[in-house]
């Protein structure tokens, strides 16, 4: 952990060039629809990016992953160590990225000596965000995938972010809801980590566990019933070590929820917030919903409240 923290000090956001625009499309999880690739490439090029497809090699595995664990890891590591690449933009999430952690760990020394890259994605990509944040000290973007955003049509209405501007200017969001008194009265600072709750929880008690000290933990999920969410939150309460500075919850309710569903999920989160002796916040504009606001993982975040709502800045 100490080595990771030292390395993180060497790779601040200011270390990234102001005009990073060389994107490698990568996919390390569930199979993607390759008929979408021309539109994905066009969308990114219209935003001013130069796009490479050389690290996409889909031969669907028995589990429905893009390829075998070994091949997915090999392609990912090649992209991570390519000095001509600035950004790894994931085509989609799904499942299977957690399986790649042992391969990344084996190549950690080589990855540390590579030019830092910015990973962009969410959902299953959480496992890879965690590795580059904690082990390499690289910041990354929890945000829309290349196949799930406003430009692709469909349900998601979140536009593709400008990565250079995001790293230069940070983010600021109002209307973050405090879920307990500590959130209302405490000005919180820390390093933002986390992402998809299922992926974060999968590391609990393992050698890939999060170092929570001085962290603000972001959690969101989809396809989880309110009872399953209650169980996941009880697991957090039962952890032997959970010394976070704060917790931020994104969206958990279904993509097209009823008002009672929204209320039920919020009630479960509020109950947890009353049991945890840490500031807890709610911002359901991050996650698998209609909107998925970008945030910078592995980077400092501040939360402060005035009256009914709070403000998140990075």
Go through each PLM region and give its residues.
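ATP/nucleoside-binding phosphotransfer catalytic cores, i.e., glycine-rich phosphate-binding loops
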Residues: 251-314
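Charged helix-capping and loop-helix junction motifs
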Residues: 68-72, 106, 231-235, 261-270
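Sec-dependent N-terminal signal peptides
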Residues: 4-13
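N-terminal small/polar loop signature for handling phosphorylated ligands or for N-terminal nucleophile
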Residues: 57-114
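Conserved anion/nucleotide-ligand pocket segment
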Residues: 137-199
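ATP/NTP phosphate-donor binding region
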Residues: 17-82
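Short, acidic/small-residue loops that bind anionic groups at enzyme active sites
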Residues: 107-131, 139-145, 279
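Internal helical hairpin/lid segments
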Residues: 208-265
């Amino acid at each position: 952990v100490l080595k990771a923290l030292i390395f993180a000090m060497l790779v601040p956001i200011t270390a990234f060039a102001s005009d990073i625009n060389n994107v490698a499309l990568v996919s390390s999880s569930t199979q993607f629809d390759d008929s979408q690739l021309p539109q994905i490439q066009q969308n990114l090029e219209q935003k001013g990016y130069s796009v490479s497809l050389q690290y996409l090699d889909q031969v669907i595995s028995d589990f429905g992953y893009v390829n075998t664990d070994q091949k997915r890891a090999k392609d990912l590591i090649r992209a991570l160590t390519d000095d001509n690449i600035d950004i790894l933009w994931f085509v989609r999430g799904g499942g299977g990225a957690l399986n790649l952690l042992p391969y990344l760990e084996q190549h950690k020394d080589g990855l540390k000596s590579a030019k830092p890259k910015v990973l962009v994605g969410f959902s299953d990509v959480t496992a890879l965000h965690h590795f580059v944040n904690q082990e390499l000290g690289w910041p990354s973007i929890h945000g829309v995938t290349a196949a799930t955003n406003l430009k692709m049509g469909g349900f998601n209405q979140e536009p593709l972010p400008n990565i250079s501007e995001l790293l230069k200017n940070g983010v600021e969001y109002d209307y973050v809801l405090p879920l307990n008194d500590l959130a209302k009265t405490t000005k919180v600072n820390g390093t933002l980590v986390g992402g998809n709750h299922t992926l974060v929880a999968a590391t609990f008690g393992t050698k890939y566990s999060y170092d929570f000290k001085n962290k603000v933990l972001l959690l969101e999920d989809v396809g989880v019933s309110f009872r399953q969410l209650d169980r996941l939150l009880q697991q957090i309460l039962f952890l032997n070590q959970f010394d976070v500075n704060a917790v931020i919850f994104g969206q958990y309710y279904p993509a097209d929820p009823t008002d009672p569903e929204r209320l039920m999920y919020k009630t479960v989160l509020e109950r947890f917030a009353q049991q945890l002796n840490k500031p807890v916040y709610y911002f359901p504009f991050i996650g698998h919903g209609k909107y998925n606001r970008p945030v910078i993982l592995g980077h400092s975040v501040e939360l402060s409240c005035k009256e009914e709502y709070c403000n998140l800045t990075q």
